[in-house]
Amino acid sequence: MLMICGMYQLFGNAFITVEGERLPGIGILDVTTQGNAKRMIGPVVLRTAYGDVVGYENHSGSTQLAPGQQSFGMVRSGKGNNGSDGTEGAVTGNVFGSYLHGPLLPANPRFADALIKLAVERALGEPFRPAQIDDEIADQARTRQVRRLVRR
C-alpha cells in the first residue's frame, strides 16, 4: 500500500493541527505529524532501498518518526518529513507512507515494480516474475533530475 501526503499522516499515530488539536490516526506507521502554517514545496531526491527516487513534495505537516520506525528514504535534495532530520516517509511491512507527489511511480520504475511484486505475491502466495520491461527512458529522466538537484 502506498499512502501519499494526507493518507500518510492518517496512517500515523496522530496529526496535531496548527491550533493544537490532536486528531488520532490509525497507527499503522509509528509517526506523528504537526501541522504548520508554512508549506514545504519543491522537487525531492531520496536515497532508498530502490535506488534514488525522485518526486515532488507539497505539505505543511512536519512528521517525526518514532524510534525504530524505518523511513522510506534519506533526503539528498528537498525537505522530506520535517526539513531537519533528513528522513522522508515511513515503511512498516508492506505499507509505504510518503510526501512525494508527482509522477512517483512512472518516474521510479524500480520502486513501482517492487510495489507490484509485493501486492501480487501477497495476493497469490507465490513468487512473482514479471517480464522484463525497458525502463531506459524513465531511468535517464530520473538520472538527469538527480544530477540537476543534487549538484545545488
Give the location of each predicted region.
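Short, flexible active-site loops
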Residues: 39-42, 55, 97-100
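Catalytic beta-strand/loop cores that center a nucleophilic Ser/Cys/Thr
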Residues: 45-93
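Acyltransferase
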Residues: 94-152
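Cysteine-nucleophile active-site neighborhood
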Residues: 1-50
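Short, acidic Gly/Pro/Ser/Thr-rich loop/turn segments
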Residues: 33-36, 62-65, 103-107
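Histidine-centered divalent metal-coordination motifs
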Residues: 5, 59, 101
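Hydrophobic/aromatic beta-strand patches that form the interior of the parallel beta-sheet core
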Residues: 2, 27, 56, 96-98
